[in-house]
């Protein structure tokens, strides 16, 4: 049974473009060879880690979203674990398809200001002042 998964993996920040491309291709080949279907692949770039991992204060993040079965996850995580360039990885099963929220409809300038003023009047907290004598 095919399920939706997300995987984020972090690689060493000092890798060259060729090494990163080769690693990314290898990861995508594992998913494709096990009949996985890519939904999204993103390179989030180099970011500061919350704490140093293997003496690296930074890491380059990659995000994958794909369909596959549990055997695919086991094989993907095995390959990521064996690769010395990968310093961390995490895979999670998504319960449902995640859909980005729709943008709010654009209102005309007159409608928007009237509604904002009405909302501000109803949502404004009551001001209270207390005097402390000492």
From Swiss-Prot:
Residues 118-134 have a biased composition (Low complexity). The keyword Nucleus does not apply. GO terms for cellular component: cytosolic small ribosomal subunit. Residues 103-134 are annotated as: Disordered. Binds together with bS18 to 16S ribosomal RNA. Belongs to the bacterial ribosomal protein bS6 family. This is Small ribosomal subunit protein bS6. It comes from Citrifermentans bemidjiense (strain ATCC BAA-1014 / DSM 16622 / JCM 12645 / Bem).
């Amino acid at each position: 049974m095919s399920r939706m998964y997300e995987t984020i993996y972090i690689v060493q920040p000092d890798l060259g473009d060729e090494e990163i491309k080769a690693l990314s291709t290898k990861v995508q080949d594992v998913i494709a060879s096990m009949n996985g279907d890519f939904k999204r692949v993103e390179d989030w770039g180099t970011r500061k880690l919350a704490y140093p991992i293997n003496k690296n204060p930074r890491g380059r993040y990659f995000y994958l979203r794909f369909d596959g079965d549990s055997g695919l996850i086991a094989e993907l995580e095995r390959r990521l674990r064996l690769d010395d360039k990968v310093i961390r990885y995490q895979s999670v099963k998504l319960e449902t398809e995640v859909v980005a929220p729709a943008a709010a409809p654009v209102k005309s300038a007159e409608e928007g200001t009237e509604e904002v003023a009405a909302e501000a009047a109803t949502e404004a907290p009551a001001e209270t002042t207390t005097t402390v004598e000492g």
